[in-house]
Amino acid sequence: MEQDNKHPLVAIKCFVYNHEPYLRDCLEGFVIQQTDFPFVAIVHDDASTDKSADIIREYATKYPDIIKPIYETENQYSKSDGSLGRVMNSAIDATGAKYVAMCEGDDYWTAPRKLQKQVDLLEADMSLMAVVTDTSVVDNMGNVLTAKRGGVVKDDIEGKYTLRDFFGTPQHAYPTASVMYRNVHAQEIRRMLAHTANGYLGNWTLWIVLHTFGDFYYLNQVTTAYRINPTSVTHTCDRIGRAKAHRTICNAVADILPSQYADISEDLRHTDWVWVSLMFAYKHEHYYFHMLGAMCMALIKCPKTLFHNISQGLRRRMNKNAQV
């Protein structure tokens, strides 16, 4: 593979905030990678109040060619003005990397050749925008809860998947730590994401936006571990707030989708958020009345999609309960 030695081929985005108990696992997952190309990890500590920054300094000293730290003295996420994303975007741009990988500070990689396998796939097929893999699920202590989560794509079949396929997946999401995407159309992607910016939904909107530029390849291998962390942003947000945010974000995503996805936009406006809202608000009975009108509209506009989404959600809920 021809490589410009002035720039790493891959840049890893790693956001850290009070991840001290888990951070070594995360950073070890970076430095064990076996590749025939250079890569860097932009590790951004958002003014942690624990010893996360000390751990990052330790690894940056030991692996200066890989670990590229950013230390904040003021928490950027709490500003809610996009500062956190802008800092990371500037750092990624400065690397000149061709591909971007992702891993939050409380998750970690388990496969030493994860990056190499993903790069090989992207280099071989220019129609691909990203490569995603499966993940295991662990608890706060690192105990494996699920060896292979599954459901990343329909029937776990390895291959290429479109945006339409994404909306038909059982999980309706990709494991963040498993994703590597092509670093192209950066300004257009950021403009689209700015229109849909919302902290409740993690990278859900990013997957959708990336899909509008190309297919995802699903590599049917476990390369990462997703940690169930009750102190993470998505676990600490109140259910009512998340339900309302999901409706807002579905409408925003519908606004930015290209015209060939008009049917998906219609589904997003009238059905997709309904099931998620029901799940987020299931302990708040009064919120159901707030959604009755929208439910009726969804039944009129997109009955098949509504019933499909609800049946998929019920199936996921039953499978999750069966594993407990």
Language-model regions: role of each:
Residues 100:
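Short aromatic/hydrophobic "clamp" motif used to bind/position activated sugar donors
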Residues 113-147:
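Conserved donor NDP-sugar-binding/catalytic core segment of glycosyltransferases
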Residues 28-38:
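Short, acidic, metal-binding catalytic loop of nucleotide-sugar glycosyltransferases
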Residues 45-54, 74-75, 104:
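A conserved acidic beta->alpha catalytic loop
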Residues 22-24, 50-59:
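Acidic helix N-cap motif at the loop->helix transition within catalytic regions
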Residues 85, 93, 133, 151-239, ...:
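Conserved nucleotide-sugar donor-binding catalytic segment
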Residues 73-95, 117:
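Glycine-rich, basic loop-to-helix element that forms the pyrophosphate-binding segment
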Residues 8-11, 40, 205:
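Cell-envelope/extracellular polymer assembly enzymes that use nucleotide-activated donors
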